[in-house]
């Protein structure tokens, strides 16, 4: 790693000089055809590594001893690659080098699905011209990009692998132990990745369910690259992130709205779980709120997707919530089997569209209808419910209505994305202010926000007036 660290601190001319003394392999400059990388990532509790390794040894797969992987990630000063959801690195392993470009994909929970291109190199020096033109946003390599990219951060870890077969699918299990580093900032890598080499995604999920039956794993949505970028920006503490209004595509179907709503909830869950495990105790409430958002999303679409479709998922949510509200530590709660199984169940429910087998022909037609039309109808219903509940002062009974108020606010966050953001925010602020006043016991503020909320005009299409 010493030479690679030297490379990180030198200019291009010096990198070429040092490359001369590095091992060179006999590989022609040809890129591999684009592959759709499908992998499920877990963060491993360091105390559980030995037990995990013992468990992996029982799977009967082909074992590969740990091998050192050294990676340099590149970026421009203005973060051009990140802005286009692209990731560029050079990887070194046993004297072999490979340039990889990952482009925009999809992350659901810890399941990463994104295209990537790999180019074999004879030395650890970037040559962007070797990448196919289809990689670039406009179909061609930007003229000045090669001169602007520079090393941003690095990873150095040992990877131990097991190749296993699950229901006819080939899966690579990789246990990575090491660190990601940017300048003087560093943090450990202790991860498990399940990558589908051939076969069906369901096999990855099946194997994952087997592995999370033991404590010590949590799904991680933050890739090594995402962590490296954060370190390179100074490693500032991440703050609480309020749930944003869901922005669905203009022509989204109700089914796509359901998927987007649950992905938003899962993203909030994982984001605040990361904060909590890093020592931000206030984030625990937001983890529970995100799990509540999952439930509220299921209720919102319950007129189409029957409850029995999500019965197992909701049972696991209940078990996980019970673990979180107990007095156990963040580490114990987050790495528990209950939490891991609930999060994985939600990921699997989304990835496999597990609601589909429960829909009859009528429901199939409904779920393919316009999410925009669905949103307008349900915005009016939830607003009417709020007015019916809070139309008159409730005295000492406001706290009894907090669950209903929270559910309605969550539902509106999931439905309001087609309208002007300022109008939506102004409308929501009064109901959110009412909820905060109830929670904090501010009686005068309760009545102020209640009056403001019930008399405000709708921002959405209603009764043909918009």
Model-predicted regions and their roles:
Residues 34-466:
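Function-determining surface determinants
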């Amino acid at each position: 790693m010493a030479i690679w660290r030297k490379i990180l601190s030198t200019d291009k001319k010096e990198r070429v000089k040092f490359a001369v003394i590095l091992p060179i392999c006999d590989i022609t400059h040809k890129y591999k055809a684009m592959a759709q990388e499908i992998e499920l990532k877990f963060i491993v509790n360091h105390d559980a590594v030995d037990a995990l390794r013992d468990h992996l040894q029982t799977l009967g797969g082909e074992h590969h001893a740990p091998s050192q992987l050294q990676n340099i990630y590149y970026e421009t000063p203005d973060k051009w690659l990140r802005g286009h959801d692209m990731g560029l690195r050079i990887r070194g392993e046993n004297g072999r080098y490979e340039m990889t470009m990952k482009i925009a994909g999809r992350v659901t929970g810890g399941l990463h699905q994104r295209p990537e291109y790999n180019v074999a190199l004879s030395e650890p020096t970037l040559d962007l011209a070797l990448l196919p033109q289809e990689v670039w946003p406009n179909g061609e390599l930007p003229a000045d990009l090669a001169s602007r990219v520079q090393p941003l951060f690095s990873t150095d870890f040992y990877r131990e692998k097991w190749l296993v077969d699950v229901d006819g699918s080939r899966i690579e299990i990789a246990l990575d132990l090491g660190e990601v580093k940017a300048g003087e900032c560093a943090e450990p890598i202790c991860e498990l990745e399940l990558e589908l080499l051939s076969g069906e995604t369901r096999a990855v999920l099946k194997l994952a369910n087997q592995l999370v039956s033991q404590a010590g794993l949590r799904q991680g949505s933050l890739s090594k690259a995402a962590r490296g970028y954060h370190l390179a920006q100074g490693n500032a503490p991440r703050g609480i992130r309020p749930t944003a209004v869901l922005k669905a595509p203009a022509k989204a179907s109700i089914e796509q709205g359901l998927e987007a709503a649950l992905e938003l909830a899962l993203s909030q869950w994982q984001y605040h779980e990361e904060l909590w495990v890093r020592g931000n105790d206030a984030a625990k409430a937001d983890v529970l709120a995100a799990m509540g958002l999952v439930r509220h999303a299921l209720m919102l679409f319950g007129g189409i997707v029957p409850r029995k479709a999500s019965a197992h998922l909701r049972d696991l949510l209940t078990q996980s919530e019970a673990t979180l509200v107990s007095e156990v530590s963040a580490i114990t709660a987050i790495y528990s089997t209950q939490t891991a199984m609930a999060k994985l169940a939600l990921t699997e429910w989304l990835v496999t569209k597990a609601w589909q087998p429960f829909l009859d022909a009528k429901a199939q037609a409904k779920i393919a209808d316009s999410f925009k039309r669905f949103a307008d109808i349900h915005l009016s219903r939830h607003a009417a419910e709020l007015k019916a509940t809070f139309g008159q002062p409730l005295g000492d009974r406001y706290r009894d209505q907090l669950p209903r108020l929270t559910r309605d606010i969550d539902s509106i966050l999931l439905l309001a994305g087609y309208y002007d953001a300022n109008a939506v925010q102004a409308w929501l602020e009064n109901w959110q202010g009412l909820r905060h006043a109830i929670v904090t016991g501010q009686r005068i503020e309760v009545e102020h926000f209640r009056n403001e909320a019930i008399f405000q005009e709708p921002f959405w299409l209603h009764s043909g007036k918009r």
